[in-house]
A protein has these predicted regions:
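Alpha/beta-hydrolase active-site loop
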Residues: 106-126
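Short amphipathic alpha-helix adjacent to the substrate-entry channel of hydrolases
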Residues: 78-97
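Alpha/beta-hydrolase fold nucleophile elbow
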Residues: 129-142
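A glycine/proline-hinged amphipathic helix-loop "lid/cap" segment
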Residues: 1-51, 211, 291-297
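Short beta-strand-to-loop junctions in surface cap/lid or active-site-entrance loops
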Residues: 41-43, 49-60, 216-220
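Alpha/beta hydrolase fold serine-hydrolase catalytic domain that processes acyl esters and thioesters
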Residues: 133-134, 149-297
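Short beta-strand element of the alpha/beta-hydrolase
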Residues: 60-69
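Glycine-rich nucleophile elbow surrounding the catalytic serine of serine-hydrolase chemistry
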Residues: 140-150
Length: 297
């Protein structure tokens, strides 16, 4: 997309640009019975959340916990509003988006600690949520895909009040400390660039050996059924492919789906790239099958 690049203008201006791009590139939020703000107690104060539900009332069941992308630096509850509303409709499940702390103001591991805390809060079915949560489905795109995996690992090792039923990392930064061929193949001209990724990493300032940044340093044995989605023209495509392979090798029921001919960020580009709608719908159909298989067992 034309215009200044995130790494050229700094975090504050880059966040404004991301909001503006939603207005021209993404689909509208559309009708939904419930869109409601709430908050969870986090390690450094309140974590803003947003609940999306196609129903005004709902019985006990799974809840999708969504963590937005943006390189750990950009994005918020508003940038991914249309996507969260859409998957709430397509899955017919409540979706709760997490407004975690962003770098560089809050470097690693602040954001992922918020995501884990939010997951534990939602799992406890607090009165403020107004839902009887029986299980979680962790989900996120890009940096949020990293968080989805890390949250699943954290709750595998130290279980919450309810289990993680499935995970859905979308073009995840699953092994960001390792180089892969797709980084060179698609690092220029496909929206996400080499320079942007290096800038995100500098802002986030993670420990590359820590599983809360590089979740593939941990065994994936015992992880929930997993749907890994990549984009065919994405510099971090191969990270998602590698993560899917690691899950298969660990005996995790895994579905891998690649949006061929699409780019990083496509879930926020349904107006600019209309085929993204079909890519999203195909993913949700698979996820519904994974969830149904687990809930009927």
């Amino acid at each position: 997309m034309p215009g200044p690049r995130s790494h050229e203008v700094g975090p504050a201006e880059a966040r404004i640009l991301m909001h503006k791009s939603r207005q021209v590139a993404d689909a509208p939020v559309g009708d939904l019975a419930t869109i409601r703000g709430l908050s969870a107690r986090g390690p450094a104060g309140e974590i803003p959340l947003r609940l999306y539900d196609a129903r005004a009332e709902r019985g006990p069941g799974p809840v999708v916990l969504f963590m937005h992308g943006g390189g750990f630096v950009l994005g918020d509850l508003d940038t991914h509003d249309p996507f969260c509303a859409e998957i709430a409709r397509l899955l017919d499940l409540p979706v709760i988006a997490v407004g975690y702390r962003l770098a560089p103001e809050h470097p690693w591991p602040a954001g992922v600690e918020d995501a884990i805390a939010a997951a534990r809060w939602v799992a406890g079915s607090p009165d403020a949520l107004g839902l009887a949560v029986t299980s979680l489905v962790t989900c996120g795109d890009s940096a949020g895909g990293n968080f989805a995996i890390v949250v699943s690992l954290a709750l595998r090792d130290e279980p919450a009040a309810v289990p993680v039923l499935a995970q859905w990392p979308i073009y995840p930064a699953a092994n960001p400390a390792k180089g892969y061929p797709s980084f060179q193949d698609f690092g220029e001209g496909y929206l996400l660039t080499h320079d942007a990724m290096r800038w995100f990493d500098d802002c986030y300032a993670p420990d590359p050996k820590d599983w809360r940044y590089s979740p593939m340093v941990k065994s994936q044995i015992g992880m929930p059924p997993t749907l890994v989605v990549t984009a065919g023209l994405d510099p971090i495509r191969d990270q998602g492919r590698a993560y899917a392979a690691a899950c298969v090798e660990a005996g995790v029921p895994t579905v891998f789906r690649e949006a061929r001919g699409n780019i990083h960020g496509f879930i926020n580009l349904r107006k600019a790239i209309p085929s993204s709608q079909a890519d999203i719908e195909g993913c949700t159909e698979i996820l519904k099958l994974l969830i149904a298989e687990r809930t009927s067992a």
